[in-house]
Design a protein with these regions (language model features):
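Interaction-surface and assembly-scaffold signal
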Residues: 2-30, 129-275
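N-terminal ordered "arm"
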Residues: 27-80
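Solvent-exposed loop and beta-edge segments used for protein-protein assembly and interaction
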Residues: 41-43, 89-93, 148
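Structured loops at beta-to-helix junctions and adjacent beta-edge loops in soluble globular domains
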Residues: 52, 79, 100-102, 119, ...
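Generic structural motif
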Residues: 53-56, 81-83, 102-106, 161, ...
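Short, structured protein-protein interaction patches enriched in aromatics and acidic/basic residues
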Residues: 68-102
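Hydrophobic alpha-helical segments and helix pairs
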Residues: 98-132
Length: 275
């Protein structure tokens, strides 16, 4: 007799590998009898900077069907999250890269932010985000931000190689949170055996509304410095092309930078498949 824990995909519950042990718990599926309050979780502290850059180089990061929207700007944001309900109060950190873009599919178009890559420092959100949502998540070491005098410093590293550092200073109260959506992603899963082909290749959308996040405080930075170190293959064997492409972008002008703190959010179960 089959074990009911392993009824498998198609029974209305969320599964991820390994499937032999029953439905997968995570941000969009809690243990039986438990529910998470989106108004109370997570607590998030963010630091961001938006830079004007070269339109030609930035456009090379967009998939087919996408075009730059407005001025050529690339946004880097560090998020430090704690008190996450689905992790039983634990947390993790994240670095996102976003590009204002328009996606056209058929006769429709969507204005939003294309997110070519996301770094996180914990396995669980990486797997659930890649497989369920189509977010392009990969791993990096993202230590806690450091504060010295009036400056905040955020760093991203991979096995000892520091590939990105953001410094913000001379902050003045106010400015609000960074606009959070809609966010567009290209979900891609390669085919087994048929190497070079895809089992999945389509665009997904994270809607901008529906979050119960409340802004606690915010500040605008008057000083902003971003350093992207170009890695050799030996430094980042599987990610050097990713970081190298970002390092190619000239940082012409910081058009906006700041910090903010929020509490609450949403589980992203409103994610939409396009195409």
């Amino acid at each position: 007799m089959a074990d009911p824990r392993n009824a498998g995909p198609g029974d209305g519950r969320l599964y991820r590998m390994p499937t032999a042990f029953g439905p997968a718990l995570g941000p969009r599926q809690a243990p039986a009898g438990m529910c998470h309050d989106p108004a109370a979780s997570p607590r998030k502290s963010c630091a961001y900077a938006a830079w004007r850059t070269d339109a030609g180089l930035l456009g090379e990061l967009l998939p087919p069907g996408f075009a730059l929207r407005g001025e050529a700007v690339v946004v880097f944001e560090f998020s430090y999250m704690t008190d996450i309900a689905w992790l039983a109060g634990r947390g993790y950190n994240m670095l996102t890269v976003r590009i204002p873009a328009t996606y056209r599919h058929g006769d429709a178009s969507v204005d939003g932010y294309f997110q070519p890559v996301v770094w996180e420092n914990l396995t669980e959100p990486i797997l659930s985000g890649r497989e369920e949502l189509g977010w392009a998540k990969i791993y990096a070491d993202l230590p806690a931000a450091t504060h010295k005098h009036d400056e905040i410093v955020c760093r991203a590293e991979w096995m000892g190689f520091r590939f990105l550092e953001l410094r913000l200073g001379a902050r003045a109260a106010g400015g609000g949170a960074l606009q959070s959506g809609p966010v567009l992603h290209r979900k891609y899963i390669p085919a087994t055996q048929h190497w070079g082909q895809a089992d999945v290749d389509y665009v997904t959308l994270t809607p901008g509304g529906g979050s119960q996040a409340r802004l606690l405080e915010s500040a605008t930075a008057q000083r902003c410095a971003l350093r992207i170190a170009r890695p050799r293959w030996e430094d980042m064997p599987t990610q050097h092309a990713i970081v190298g492409a970002l390092a190619d972008l000239p940082l012409l002008e910081c058009v906006r930078a700041g910090t903010y703190q929020t509490v609450g959010g949403k589980d992203l179960s409103d994610q939409v498949r396009l195409g």
